[in-house]
Amino acid sequence: MENIEGKEEQILIRITGQDRPGLTAAVMGILARYNARILDIGQADIHSTLSLGILIRIDDMHSGQVMKELLFKAEELNVNIGFAPISDDEYESWVDHQGKNRYILTVIGRSLSAKQIAAATKIIAEQGLNIDFIRRMTGRMSIKYPERNVRACIEFSLRGTPKDRELMQSKLMHLASEQEIDFSFQRDDMYRRMRRLICFDMDSTLIQTECIDELAARAGVGDKVKAITERAMRGEIDFKESFTERVALLKGLDVSVMQDIAEHMPITEGADRLMSVLKRCGYKIAILSGGFTFFGEQLRRRYGIDYVYANELEIDENGKLTGRYVGDIVDGKRKAELLKLIAQVEQVNLAQTIAVGDGANDLPMIAEAGLGIAFHAKPRVKATAQQSINNIGLDGVLYFLGFKDSYLGEQGKL
């Protein structure tokens, strides 16, 4: 159709109803005939129910005819349609707000209820943040086979700046503990979907045990090692001193005991799924552990891990532990240094790094990483880390990275 120049106006078109193939194409076909320009568009489909919004700019000489044709087409397609004029000032105000900060709030649990979401969105509102869109990250929930529903995750895209981020984080942590759900609140920038290096603690993170406790139990010194650990936790001795004392108690233990423990290490829920996806997507993976390389190497072989840095136990010519270690101790400070070193070697920006751990020794690397996650962590670590997972498995990390179950296909299933 020939376009006769005139004054232009903005019209917001809203369409709801039963979705079907070709509906959007039919609407766009009408708009195309009148040379309408698309200023904004968004569509959502929930249980085959469509919600489509289109903001157009069109010559006001044609706007009446366009709306008339769209009304007839909506009736033909059995959908609801509405129109709202948008003034130039309103439109420009909307454009000016596009530079506002964006954040992503991820909510994860074994299941999610209206009560939990109501509490989370109340905190969002109190902080003056606006929800741009909401999407489900996990697969569809079966009513017939509830045992298949192992986790639920919803992601909120938010716009604005929190009035008090520290207070918001505190309220989210309290809600997480009270409602048995997990949260991640992070800036939605280009690095969020471009993470490239992930560093894990090993004991009580990738595996559900503390290897030094297993070794101590086999050596018959479990109570002594536990007492030293408790002294360290009270701050009576530092990590290096406590580590040296505990290793000394393992003197004489046969290396075959280590092999037996390594072969039967309990793998953390979700670790297999997480590692499969990370390797498939090209992530570099590191273990940075205050534990022992012997067990880290077992995990390297299992998952194809790229880097393992842990503590080396000295073994004598008879295959017995000497009660000493070789090289420098990997403590919290060293973990943070190693994260930065590996990032440099791999030419990865620190904003593209992830650190996951449970203990106080993990806090330095969690703080250093672009995304630091406390996993089933000690209270002090949970209180310090910006993101935490306490109620589901290790594969919950995937949702913090923006993965949807629908992206993962068969390899992403349990």
Feature map (PLM): residue ranges:
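Acidic, glycine-rich loop-and-beta core segments that form the ion-binding/anion-interacting portion
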Residues: 211, 216, 220-230, 234, ...
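Solvent-exposed alpha-helical segments within well-ordered globular domains of core cellular machineries
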Residues: 25, 29, 68, 72, ...
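Long, charged amphipathic helices and adjacent flexible linkers at domain junctions
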Residues: 90-99, 185-196, 229-255, 411-414
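Active-site neighborhood of HAD-like aspartate-dependent phosphohydrolases
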Residues: 31, 190, 194-240
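C-terminal cap/substrate-recognition subdomain and adjoining C-terminal extension
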Residues: 252-414
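A conserved regulatory-domain signal marking ACT and ACT-like small-molecule sensing domains
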Residues: 1-195
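Short glycine/serine/threonine-rich phosphate/pyrophosphate-binding segments
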Residues: 23-24, 116, 206-209, 362-365
